[in-house]
Design a protein with these regions (language model features):
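Hydrophobic transmembrane alpha-helices
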Residues: 32-40, 51-100
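Regulatory cytosolic signal-relay segments
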Residues: 82-145
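Catalytic NTP-binding/metal-coordinating core of nucleotidyl cyclase/transferase enzymes
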Residues: 141-216
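Generic alpha-helical transmembrane segments
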Residues: 17-39
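Catalytic core of nucleotidyl cyclases, primarily class III adenylyl/guanylyl cyclases
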Residues: 187-213, 229-268
């Protein structure tokens, strides 16, 4: 798109400009998209930098990749077939490099990259759905929705906090919450709240039930923590261990707050899920899934479910 806009602004619309932009931009765009989706380690290393330092660094990184790949593709076209190059790129490389066109193009690339990275980081920090819903006023009026909720709670958090001290424990939670966010997003979950050492993840009901996405998300989170277990052992002397509960149903959702508005969920579903989470220790289970959820989704063949029985949860009249 950037190549097409530049070509149109510089030379007006013509098929040569369009073909130039497509031939150069499509492989460059795919390559940069691949690099960015594989940049988990880059984000992880620089996550404690200030927002603007990280933003500028990431933008510079993308622009460097962009220009390197662009030049590589142009040189490759020349090497493969000079006649083809002269047809597709009517302006010589020397003309492009030796005039202000290069600086114009770099300025456009830098501005577009900075703006897109700013939006991406804003979405990542504040929540993509939350921003759209607040701006569009989707929940300005109270509504009911069918949703799934996954409560993930860190085990032995009180003992860990006393052992590490408040400051070190806060760093520990930062790393833990950061690392589990990637698999949550990969499985289409949205973090609703961080409550102490607990994270609440939610899905629209059908999206979470399809292919048992919500259940598989839990195991993806486990895998992510195992991936960084050596880091946690070296940095903190322990690896996070957690339990979780999954339940779903009808909840009330609305926009609350005047000066710090947010989307809030209310209803029996959240209370029940929290009570289920409290049963994990008693039942020696890392994950409890309600029979209501099990009955509406098809579990992967590699997962085995055990019926834990029927329980009267605290504060609940109906058994689950």
């Amino acid at each position: 798109l950037l190549f097409a806009v530049y070509a149109f602004a510089r030379y007006g619309f013509n098929w040569i400009a369009l073909s130039t932009s497509l031939i150069a931009s499509v492989p460059v765009g795919f390559a940069i998209a691949f690099f960015e989706t594989q940049s988990q380690e880059f984000r992880r290393r620089h996550r404690r930098n200030s927002f603007w330092i990280y933003l500028v660094y990431r933008t510079f990184r993308v622009v460097v990749w962009f220009m390197m790949l662009f030049f590589f593709i142009m040189l490759l076209v020349i090497w493969l077939n000079v006649d083809t190059y002269e047809t597709i790129f009517p302006h010589s490389l020397y003309d492009f490099f030796a005039t202000r066109k290069l600086f114009e193009f770099l300025a456009i690339a830098l501005a577009v990259s900075l703006f897109s990275n700013f939006l991406d980081e804003l979405h990542r920090k504040l929540g993509r759905d939350a921003i759209y819903n607040l701006v569009l006023g989707k929940y300005h009026q109270v509504k009911q929705e069918e949703r799934l909720f996954l409560f993930i709670d860190l085990n032995d958090s009180t003992d860990i906090a006393e052992e590490m001290g408040e400051l070190e424990y806060s760093h520990f939670l930062q790393d833990y919450f950061y690392d589990i966010s990637e698999p949550i997003a990969r499985y289409f979950g949205r973090v609703y709240q961080y409550v102490g050492d607990e994270v609440v993840v939610t899905w629209p009901l059908q999206k979470g039930l399809r292919y048992a996405v919500a259940v598989r998300c839990y195991f993806a989170v486990q895998k992510q923590i195992r991936r960084y277990s050596a880091y946690y052992e070296k940095r903190y002397g322990r690896v996070p261990v957690f339990k979780a509960a999954l339940h779903g149903g009808t909840v009330v959702v609305s926009e609350v707050g005047k000066y710090k508005s947010e989307i809030a969920y209310h209803g029996d579903v959240l209370n029940t899920t929290a009570r289920m989470l409290g049963k994990c220790h008693e039942l020696a289970s890392d994950l409890l899934v309600s029979n209501w959820v099990i009955g509406q989704t098809t579990m992967p063949a590699y997962l085995k479910t055990d019926d834990m029985g029927v329980f009267q949860l605290k504060g609940k009249q109906q058994e689950i």
